[in-house]
């Protein structure tokens, strides 16, 4: 949301053949830009109104933008929005073709006599590239997950110049791409990743990463590392009502807020967020691996957004056990030993320390971490965006 009027310095659409352009900066009714830590790419939405005779078509006749370019999806969009206050830096997606937006779809098209209105749904280039490539490479068991993520971004998404912060992972992991899409593989690897800041083989409580894109590029971040960052130096204050455009502190005032979700006990029990029992069979030695995951063993090790320690309720008044003591979900699976290793030896087959991303530990911890991240969902409206 913006209090001051946005300043559109550039808002240009290129035709699919890049032979014609249309400047729509004067016809933008609304522009919404999204960075989402749960989305692997940027998205944006722009509502445009336009009068006829804006673009010269292929036949040389002046036409509307929708039919003159024409708009059919895949066109590039250059956007530059100046900062509308002393603290806002604005948005610039016009300096490098690698940062241009692409039209994913055109919706809400209304054509009247002499005018037209439509909505452009935009994505970053990698969202389209992701649909056209597949990863078939075999990644060795000696390579860290963070290095595999960098390889996929560079070789398959061709985004070597858009790599942001890639947190180093502690654990290596060998796998085969199986012709899956790059974004699918990276988000899958995120759930198997352990922060490199954890003590090797002793403290894996920080399992769980996030993969997302910002203006600075693609980021592969540990949830623990994100939570351990220093708080923002300014405090945001709930101030309902009108906000003055001349108020220097308007960027740090919350106009309205709503709590979309605050705990979902049954959902967490169904997912085994507190405690789960796991049965894994080694297909090489046929030795079963049976373990119980108990979140109480990790509560003190976790980084949280608040100061209070997570406390789970008791099951009933006659028992001292909490919801973190008894498994609420059972997992059954096969260990992927004997498929990726270069040497046909039994090393690591029954050694959980050398096992390829031991799911009995990492899967349980990452599931607990993701569920804790969604304990509360709050929707805030802050008048700080350009």
Predicted regions and their residues:
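Short secondary-structure capping/junction motifs at helix and strand boundaries
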Residues: 88-91, 100, 159-164, 197-201, ...
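N-terminal export/assembly leaders
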Residues: 130-133, 149-177
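An acidic/polar, Gly/Ser/Thr-rich interaction patch typically located in mid-to-C-terminal regions
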Residues: 34, 38-69, 243-386
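Glycine-centered loop/turn motifs
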Residues: 72-78, 142, 235, 241
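Short beta-strand-centered interaction patches in the first periplasmic/extracellular domains
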Residues: 117, 124-126, 165-277, 281, ...
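Alpha-helical support elements that line or immediately flank enzyme active sites
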Residues: 137-144
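Extracytoplasmic/secreted envelope proteins and their assembly/folding machinery
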Residues: 146-150, 186
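Assembly/oligomerization scaffold segments
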Residues: 1-132
